[in-house]
Amino acid sequence: MFTVFLLVVLATTVVSFTSGRSTFRGRNAAAKASGLVSLTDRRPQCCSHPACNVDHPEICR
């Protein structure tokens, strides 16, 4: 009985760990996309500021 309990705990841990990682990747990608959209909205301010222009050359082309 104890062995079955340990197997259930292990299976639950593995499933929650792997699903948590994929969810984190999705949120991270969404956060990056959201950040790029907000930078694109501020294009004139960013492109005229040298430090921002160097950090984000993809929006100042």
Curated annotation (Swiss-Prot):
Position of the signal peptide: 1-20
Instruction: Output a single Gene Ontology CC term carried by this record.
Output: host cell postsynaptic membrane
Q: Which residues carry this modification: 4-hydroxyproline?
A: P44, P50
- Where do the segments described as Ser-Xaa-Pro motif, crucial for potent interaction with nAChR lie? 48-50
Residues excised as propeptide? 21-42
Query: Which tissues is this chain's protein expressed in?
Result: Expressed by the venom duct.
Q: Where in the cell is it found?
A: Secreted
The organism's superkingdom is given as Eukaryota
Annotated keywords: Acetylcholine receptor inhibiting toxin, Disulfide bond, G-protein coupled receptor impairing toxin, Hydroxylation, Neurotoxin, Postsynaptic neurotoxin, Secreted, Signal, Toxin
GO-annotated molecular function: acetylcholine receptor inhibitor activity; toxin activity
Q: Where are the transmembrane segments?
A: none
Q: What is its main location?
A: secreted
Domain comment, as recorded: The cysteine framework is I (CC-C-C). Alpha4/7 pattern.
Instruction: Please give the family membership noted in the entry.
Output: Belongs to the conotoxin A superfamily.
Functional description taken from the UniProt entry: Alpha-conotoxins act on postsynaptic membranes, they bind to the nicotinic acetylcholine receptors (nAChR) and thus inhibit them. This toxin also inhibits high voltage-activated (HVA) calcium channel currents in rat DRG neurons (8% inhibition at 1 uM toxin) probably by activating GABA(B) receptors (GABBR1 and/or GABBR2).
Its protein name is Alpha-conotoxin-like Tx1.2
Give the species. Conus textile (Cloth-of-gold cone)
